Amino acid sequence: MLCSRYFTSSLFLWGEALPTLLEEFLNEVEKMLKNQVNTRRIHQLLKELDDPLLENKDLEEKLQAFLDYVKEIPNLPEARKRYRIQKSLEMIEKLRSWFLIDYLECSGEEVDLSTDIQYAKGVGPNRKKKLKKLGIETLRDLLEFFPRDYEDRRKIFKLNDLLPGEKVTTQGKIVSVETKKFQNMNILTAVLSDGLVHVPLKWFNQDYLQTYLKQLTGKEVFVTGTVKSNAYTGQYEIHNAEVTPKEGEYVRRILPIYRLTSGISQKQMRKIFEENIPSLCCSLKETLPERILEKRKLLGVKDAYYGMHFPKTFYHLEKARERLAYEELFVLQLAFQKIRKEREKHGGIPKKIEGKLAEEFIKSLPFKLTNAQKRAHQEIRNDMISEKPMNRLLQGDVGSGKTVVAQLAILDNYEAGFQTAFMVPTSILAIQHYRRTVESFSKFNIHVALLIGATTPSEKEKIKSGLRNGQIDVVIGTHALIQEDVHFKNLGLVIIDEQHRFGVKQREALMNKGKMVDTLVMSATPIPRSMALAFYGDLDVTVIDEMPPGRKEVQTMLVPMDRVNEVYEFVRQEVMRGGQAFIVYPLIEESDKLNVKSAVEMYEYLSKEVFPEFKLGLMHGRLSQEEKDRVMLEFAEGRYDILVSTTVIEVGIDVPRANVMVIENPERFGLAQLHQLRGRVGRGGQEAYCFLVVGDVGEEAMERLRFFTLNTDGFKIAEYDLKTRGPGEFFGVKQHGLSGFKVADLYRDLKLLEWAREDVQEIDVEGIELPEEIKLIEVG
């Protein structure tokens, strides 16, 4: 047995100690080494150690040597103490690596993983049909069908330590078995005893277990089940327990729990995996370079897959998950690296920029640039004068001043003698950008054109001609810019606004209008770093992380649905003062399934019953783009006092007088969407308000909304949204398939994502064939 003789013995324990596993012991000691070494606590943990791994003599010796090394730390001088703590932490990692992971020993023939699942051990034609319902059709599918959960049966609780509501594993002898028949139910009861305590085990209408349990009478067994308190006697009992002989196969280990389909039980499923997974894992070829495995201390592919199905410890499971998550992210970054390298092959055109126009423009502005804007402009300019084509993502919060930075890039590009193409997702945004740009550049001899779907055929031809002969310096437009018959004389800069509405292919199509053009992508939605690396891994990232001084925050309030009339009255007062309001609903039309309001029905109600004295507009996703643009322009021009809408206005033109945003059923939106909606008001510099009108929602939804009301930083909100809703929901669409990672999680795996981005720089990507599914990053 492990000895605690090296630690002080003047200890006391608070009651009966619960068993401690080796990995828990190492985790606790690691925490102490990073904070303060407590030899009394280590001694207490040693007394509680109960782990089947301790039967390994080699482990016992190495663990004792480790404890010998740690015991002196509190008495050492500071410098030696720091050194020994560092070495102790390294020893913990070695102990984990040696004893907490099962390393596969492979022998025999390799298996073809594309083989039909029918030929797996224990499957056959009948089970093949059942497994197909789960998406398992080949041996590789079986290998990649990871458990949905795990059950830890390593800790053995004493019968007198049981607590109601807990699922536990305990042990003892079956001393009696009997069945009692009632009118609607048969109750099978077996009594488990450790010699001092007796606990009834109960099953309901499961008479078939009686024979099995009688065979185990008088024998030592392990029992796993949920502890209940008897409603009449108060005695603890275990319901629907799984009883295993002491020498059974599912004893003192972590068990995988798989998704099931009708006709196949968890026990049968587990058996199929146990019979096949070792040989399937041994048939895998290593996919990552050896130097990366060593550098990042990652498991080999065989041990990682095995650990996902049959982890020896939770440390083993986490290392397995880490390896496979890293690989998914590595392959994604590899794809982006290939795109980067392909672009760099062609080189860029170093632009000669003196900066005189930009300097003159900055002086003419009625405000000073923030330091973040200056830094962003300098990063973009450095790209433009370099020999590599720029591929940069510019992002910042709502109102952080991205447009001015883009205008400075246009001026630099013009000064160098090149044309600019500025693509946005909607005509109305194109019109807004066009008007702003014309106004901003009125002092300069820059010819700006607008090319959208509504542009007349004759005007289109005139613009196309001007682009071809170089008379037009800047063109602002929608998808019309990537039509085949749009050609440029000397395109040098492509700016794409609201990037997440365009795919990589559309971006590339516009870039291909010129030779070695610089590309600036602008995202209005603040994107967490992990999302930026995953969605825009082929781009460098510039963040405007500073808001202009003096910008007023929008006051945000949660209001219960039964006080919505007070909100309407507030809207009335603000409109009478000259303001305008948005009232947003999650649906276009009323839904029978969801108890939420819709834009159409509420428009009718608000127009007639609540605001008959005001002009109301209606906008939703079913309107054509032309109709949406018309309504939005009319609202911006003041023809409507209130705009009733769905989230189609989350990104739209500025409405300077709009200062009230009312969002009903806000729990139906992501926080990133809500933040964009809130950003629609207060753009004229006046006091602005955002009301979240909430009905009967769960605590989790309320927690999200409370977080939103207390935070105005778009990046914090984006991180929180990613954490709580995932990447697919974050953008409102399942984009790029990134929500389809089997293992990787963009919120928790930022470190792995950064590793992968760094590591692909060391790889020669020439000739590397990417998996078929990774080509999804090119989806337009």
From Swiss-Prot:
It holds the Pfam family DEAD. InterPro entries: ATP-dep_DNA_helicase_RecG (IPR004609), DEAD/DEAH_box_helicase_dom (IPR011545), Helicase_ATP-bd (IPR014001), Helicase_C-like (IPR001650), NA-bd_OB-fold (IPR012340), P-loop_NTPase (IPR027417), RecG/Mfd (IPR047112), RecG_dom3_C (IPR045562). Residues 563-728 form the Helicase C-terminal domain. Residues 351-549 are annotated as: Domain 2. It catalyses: Couples ATP hydrolysis with the unwinding of duplex DNA by translocating in the 3'-5' direction; ATP + H2O = ADP + phosphate + H(+). GO terms for biological process: DNA recombination; DNA repair. It comes from the Bacteria. Transmembrane segments: none annotated. Keywords: ATP-binding, DNA damage, DNA recombination, DNA repair, DNA-binding, Helicase, Hydrolase, Isomerase, Nucleotide-binding. Residues 383-544 form the Helicase ATP-binding domain. Residues 154-252 are annotated as: Wedge domain. Its EC number is 5.6.2.4. Belongs to the helicase family. RecG subfamily. Plays a critical role in recombination and DNA repair. Helps process Holliday junction intermediates to mature products by catalyzing branch migration. Has replication fork (Y-DNA) regression activity, unwinds stalled or blocked replication forks to make a HJ that can be resolved. Has a DNA unwinding activity characteristic of a DNA helicase with 3'-5' polarity. Might be a DNA translocase rather than a bona fide helicase. This is ATP-dependent DNA helicase RecG. It comes from Thermotoga maritima (strain ATCC 43589 / DSM 3109 / JCM 10099 / NBRC 100826 / MSB8). The gene is recG.
